[in-house]
Regions:
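C-terminal/domain-edge helix-coil "capping" segments
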Residues: 23-43, 132-232
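Intrinsically disordered, low-complexity segments enriched in Ser/Pro/Gly/Ala and basic residues
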Residues: 2, 22-24, 101
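Bacterial N-terminal signal peptides
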Residues: 8-20
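Bacterial N-terminal signal peptides that target proteins for export
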Residues: 1-9
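N-terminal segment of the mature soluble domain
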Residues: 41-131, 195, 199
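Short alpha-helical segments and helix-capping/turn motifs at coil-helix boundaries
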Residues: 1-2, 17, 106-110
Length: 232
């Protein structure tokens, strides 16, 4: 019997190793000295999609979902790049959209010098991984406890039933399925100093799912929900 249970535990270990890893929690870094309560508005840059595989329509959906959830969850005024350019253009009397097309270095310098006038913090984000994988659980043997009954008659002709349990092997064939593999990085900066105040890296893998956008949205919601908690 000991040898049977030893085989069972070895097979069980093989099954767990075959499953895709699920991150238990995001990895955060927070500046403990920063006063998040003084934040009144935030600049949300488009998420960087450079290192992830996606179509043009997927990219548009990713950006739209990202900004929509950030604005909804933060519950404080948030601005995107279009509004940022407009606000700074009005403040300095020059058209930032035109400058960005003709001189990227000057545009970057003007934004850096004037960002603090329109936002308290700004957030840069990056989509690192956006894929669908396949997990495989090898064929293995499970063990099931079954109850068996024996009936007999005693010397007086009375029928009795006794039960006893035993463990029996159950063969489980190989199984496979999809899982989403989505990883994002977030970095929030103080607009006045450029100092990093809150970063997060989160990998989420969801078994039996091929809905990458749903997994992506969960990560985005988690970050901005937690940022809101710090601000409140």
């Amino acid at each position: 019997m000991k040898s049977l249970f030893r085989v069972f535990f070895l097979m069980l270990a093989a099954v767990f190793l075959a499953l895709p890893h699920v991150s238990a929690s995001p990895v955060d870094s927070v500046d403990p000295s920063y006063d998040f309560h003084q934040i009144k508005n935030v600049m949300i840059y488009d998420i960087d999609l450079t290192d992830s595989a996606h179509t043009d329509s997927e990219a548009a959906s990713l950006q739209q979902n990202f900004h929509m959830q950030a604005a909804k969850l933060l519950e404080i005024p948030s601005i995107d790049k279009e509004r940022l350019n407009r606000k700074i253009s009005l403040a300095i009397g020059r058209d930032l959209d035109v400058i960005e097309k003709s001189d990227v270095e000057e545009y970057t310098s003007l934004v850096k010098d004037n960002l603090k006038a329109v936002a308290d913090i700004y957030v840069h984000s990056e989509l690192v991984s956006y894929t669908i994988g396949t997990y495989t659980i090898p064929a293995h043997t499970d063990w099931k406890t079954v109850t068996e009954y024996d009936t007999y008659r005693d010397s007086n002709g009375i029928t009795h039933t006794i039960s006893h349990q035993r463990t029996v092997p159950i063969f489980v064939p190989e199984q496979s399925g999809p899982y989403t593999n989505v990883k994002l990085r977030f970095s929030a900066y103080d607009a006045k100093t450029g100092k990093v105040i809150f970063t997060r890296e989160e990998l989420r893998q969801e078994q039996d799912s091929n809905d990458r956008l749903d997994t992506y949205n969960k990560i985005v919601r988690s970050y901005f929900r937690d940022l809101k908690k710090k601000i409140k």
